[in-house]
Amino acid sequence: EHFRVDAADYPNIGSSERRLVVYFSRMGYVKKQAYEEADKTGAALYEIQSTERTEGTLGFWWCGRFAMHRWDMPIEPISVDLSKYEQVTICSPIWVFALAAPVRSFCRQAAGKIQKVDYILVHHTGGIYENAAKEMDTLLGITHTSLRSVQCKMGKYKEIKER
């Protein structure tokens, strides 16, 4: 099952040259959050593309293997100049209670190239996943300005606040 995201529903995307939203989405849950954030802020969008199989049931199990071992997953080379943006928002799914492997790879490649960063983490549990934010901070060599943790269950989103 996939979420459908229609770019025409988000007319403000790309209206600001100062912001960028980066995302990886296997099934569309994170893509929807990324598009909403980009539309709200006028940011441009950049999708992280894995070179591994991530689609379907086999993709689910393959991604789980990377997640369990906390391995990087090969991705396409970053094709956007990250240093030209004042603010970058990274949207990531949580896999096996940790940062998704393609986003881990992106952060490693993007180290030292991002001026200011914030995170949106999408998952199916009630956690905040500060561990994933700390890992991204370490990989990027920068401290995030904010973290939003969003639970998605049965197609409904709910922001998880600190307790």
Language-model-detected regions and their locations in the chain:
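FMN-binding flavodoxin-like domain, especially the glycine-rich phosphate-binding loop
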Residues: 1-20, 25-50, 62-163
